[in-house]
A protein has these predicted regions:
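G-domain G4 guanine-recognition motif of GTPases
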Residues: 10, 143, 168-182, 205-212
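Gly/Ala-rich phosphate-binding loop of Rossmann-like dinucleotide-binding domains
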Residues: 28, 132, 160
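Walker A/P-loop phosphate-binding motif and the immediately C-terminal alpha-helix
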Residues: 2-40
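NTP-binding/hydrolysis catalytic cores, primarily Walker-type P-loop NTPases
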Residues: 219-235
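P-loop/Walker-type NTP enzyme "switch/lid" segment
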Residues: 37-111, 216-220
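Beta-strand-loop-alpha "switch" segments that mediate conformational coupling across diverse proteins
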Residues: 195-223
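Inter-motif core of Ras-like GTPase G domains
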Residues: 108-111, 125-147
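Conserved C-terminal guanine-recognition region of P-loop GTPase G domains, centered on the G4
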Residues: 149-163
Length: 235
């Protein structure tokens, strides 16, 4: 997939989907034509944060043979959105061959999108890694907690050793300031490069903010909040 960004994390609960959604909208506000795909098949929730109620999902592609173009919804700022489907147990574990077929089927999106943002499942599953290895840029979301460090480390270990991925951008979420984000990143980077041939780049910090939490509750991305100037700059 060309011109594509995957947003990943070693564990759930670190704000991965929030960052993927707001990143997609920020890029669209900058004038790019953006598509957002929720690749957490069967357990998707990006549509909730977008305030979109999708009529179809990726299940219709995997199970019913519909082309990807037929399951696209239009979200805020005109972004194109592909839902991963929610509460659909029959697509929780997609076979590897089906994953590759799906990735190939996404290529037609290139004709009307400048960038594809993919929200991939948390953790180092085969599904996550298949998408991670197919995109141009891989963003890892990290928070300053030992469990997040360990799970992100495990994700990078698998991506690097099993899939040959070397370049990772790291976003540190829920920080008090940019200096704190830089410290957390440096500590994590030192732990990773000690053992793996990987390149980690600091992609910035996202502030801990009630406005972000309120936006989630309102089903409205924070970058669309006119009063959330600091939060907008972070994305």
């Amino acid at each position: 997939m060309s011109k594509s960004i995957a947003v990943a994390s070693g564990k759930g609960g670190v704000g991965k989907t929030t960052i993927a959604v707001n990143l997609a909208l920020t890029l669209s506000q900058m004038g790019s034509k953006i598509s957002l795909m929720d690749a957490d098949f069967g357990l998707a929730n990006a549509h909730i944060m977008l305030g979109v109620n999708p009529k179809r999902s990726i299940r219709d592609v995997l199970k019913n043979g519909l082309p990807v173009e037929d399951v696209i919804e239009t979200g805020p700022n005109g972004i194109k959105f592909i839902s991963g489907g929610s509460g659909l147990t029959d697509i929780l574990n997609v076979e590897k061959n089906s994953m590759f077929q799906l990735i190939n089927s996404i290529n037609p999106l290139e004709k009307y999108t400048d960038k594809l943002v993919v929200d991939i499942p948390a953790g180092a599953s085969e599904q996550s890694m298949t998408f991670a290895s197919a995109v141009d840029k891989l963003v890892i979301v990290l928070v300053g907690e030992p469990t997040s460090f360990m799970d992100a480390y495990t994700f990078i270990k698998s991506a690097n050793l099993d899939y040959g991925i070397q370049n990772f951008s790291v976003v540190v979420n829920m920080v008090d300031n940019e200096e704190s984000a830089q410290r957390i990143f440096s500590k994590f980077q030192n732990a990773v490069i000690k053992f793996f041939d990987a390149n980690l780049t600091f992609a910035g910090g996202i502030p801990r903010s009630k406005k972000v939490q309120n936006a989630i509750m309102k089903k409205t991305p924070v970058v669309l909040d006119k009063e959330a100037e600091l939060e907008k700059l972070a994305f």
